[in-house]
Swiss-Prot record:
Belongs to the peptidase S15 family. GO terms for cellular component: cytoplasm. This is Xaa-Pro dipeptidyl-peptidase. Its EC number is 3.4.14.11. It catalyses: Hydrolyzes Xaa-Pro-|- bonds to release unblocked, N-terminal dipeptides from substrates including Ala-Pro-|-p-nitroanilide and (sequentially) Tyr-Pro-|-Phe-Pro-|-Gly-Pro-|-Ile. It comes from Streptococcus pyogenes serotype M49 (strain NZ131). The active site is at S349, D469, H499. One of its GO terms (molecular function) is dipeptidyl-peptidase activity. The gene is pepX. It is found in: Cytoplasm. GO terms for biological process: proteolysis. SMART domains: PepX_C, PepX_N.
Amino acid sequence: MRYNQFSYIPTSLERAAEELKELGFDLDLQKTAKANLESFLRKLFFHYPDSVYPLSHLIAKNDMDALSFFQSEQELSKEVFDLLALQVLGFIPGVDFTEADAFLDKLAFPIHFDETEIIKHIHHLLATRCKSGMTLIDDLVSQGMLTMDNDYHFFNGKSLATFDTSQLIREVVYVEAPLDTDQDGQLDLIKVNIIRPQSQKPLPTLMTPSPYHQGINEVANDKKLYRMEKELVVKKRRQITVEDRDFIPLETQPCKLPIGQNLESFSYINSYSLNDYFLARGFANIYVSGVGTAGSTGFMTSGDYAQIESFKAVIDWLNGRATAYTSHSKTHQVRADWANGLVCTTGKSYLGTMSTGLATTGVDGLAMIIAESAISSWYNYYRENGLVCSPGGYPGEDLDVLTELTYSRNLLAGDYLRHNDRYQELLNQQSQALDRQSGDYNQFWHDRNYLKNAHQIKCDVVYTHGLQDWNVKPRQVYEIVNALPSTINKHLFLHQGEHVYMHNWQSIDFRESMNALLCQKLLGLANDFSLPEMIWQDNTCPQNWQERKVFGTSTIKELDLGQELLLIDNHYGEDEFKAYGKDFRAFKAALFKGKANQALVDILLEEDLLINGEIVLQLKVKSSENKGLLSAQILDYGKKKRLGDLPIALTQSSIDNGQNFSREPLKELPFRENSYRVISKGFMNLQNRNNLSSIETIPNNKWMTVRLPLQPTIYHLEKGDTLRVILYTTDFEHTVRDNSNYALTIDLSQSQLIVPIASN
């Protein structure tokens, strides 16, 4: 374990003493440091009728227990404080450590003993993570140190778990959206699942916009998947044009219906544990699946601003600007009289994507988004540089396949009976509009590109993204964070994992940092919390996070690739082609072992290199035919210890998100020896070699200059490391599988790897 503490708010002595007193700690500025520490420790054992016994089970020195120390005349020293602090946080002498000083250095322990600062040290200790993954104060509250009185209690600028999660209100309302996405002449209704604690105070809301939460149709999804085996189409030379079109919602009328009291209820919904954490701290949770999902009406428009509007309508309702009904019969309306109107959206992948889309509307009431692994341009999710390009792990998927997965109205037999014919018509229109034949950018994709509206974002934004996420690739977050207005508060966490959540990782206090931010933004707490704009997980060692200033630098280093002419054959033998098509993982294994068709260049680094931004391959290339696709991957190659990309559980249920509520495992990325790590990758239809808007011809056997931008990253390579460049054509995970008999030739003498670099 190593501490990377971003959530602690430096506190004055007076404020620290006041907060400790509010928690029931009997500390006195006039007492000695030793007496105050003893009083603090005894309070920790509030479950015991007598603190003598548990105190005797701590050691103050290697040869003295804590009880004996406090009964002695010996003075409090750094050695004693450090040893006791470690034990209070759950570290066991002789098991987790033998030499405390060395262990503290390894931990990067954030508290440095000064006898005159003991009150502040105790305050800081309570806000510091235990070995279990919870802060000490959260651990104590979870054990019942504070009663669940359904009111707010704060410590170090963060809300504590004092809301009773055993008496939650669970209710359903149906919000009227200014939409008619299925064109049935009726405004669409949006189902909203609400979970909120009982409270006399207006509550802020965490809203998870999740098209998955009302169920998914995996059978329809699998039937809709596309075969990837097809020839690369030769496209006609042309220029693509699109236009920015404002989304115009339909008109709605003020509701004059009576207020209803009897709301639909529910017992369970698949919740997000970060939401659960805040539910216990006085934040209502709502789950909204939007148009075209079970319980709602309308068509699943998948990614456009009509879908975004269906979520926006819910924020409007929370602020009194939209109508909600008690049921589909629309006999009574219901108002959000429990809400303070301030909303933060949460969730990963599609969920985080909807958060970005919502933010670009500038809707009043949306105070903050926490968007994890979020898409900012749907074209860049399903296409790349004029190619159909499947997200990592999902060959054959496209946006209409996702529509089939999430149009959960068809899981309700009555809805299927009444609406499936119309749904199939609209789905067919969507399938045609996305143009899988060419892979080109068009108006359909432009209408699902949130980047063009990034200037309208006015809420605070928090993004998290994995630099090993080949599902929602790093370009998605790179482009949105660099398009954000300079006037807003923005924060970016870049981790070394894949498509995963990070709130329950051991090495970073993400949960607590979000608590401090949300108390600021949604509760109006003046806590003076400041979070860096960007925090990056160092790839060279375990559990090390660093503050960085920017994602993407303008300083570049050009690396020569060699002098040879390299030939890349596109064609595989029939058996090999079928085997790779059946299992793309077998293809990846062969590719990284140098066995698949490829041109390979190894670059031995003569100095450290901190990559920060978009690597570009500038290549001199020619094709034997009038078509060609180019794929590239950059590896950190050679055996050494590296971070894995999938977090593993260190404990099974040590994190309590309330008071014995929604427990979850503590996780972390492992640090193990392996043979390589993918740094970046990229794909291009050579007919789109200049830009997305220009379709060019490919002259047979004529040299072309190609600039292939790869996925942005931040990655630290050290002197002596090997940077491996792999150039090839068909990628059996991502691209169409064209097995035609053509070849590409690369002139390495006229080619470079252009690397954006930053100072370390």
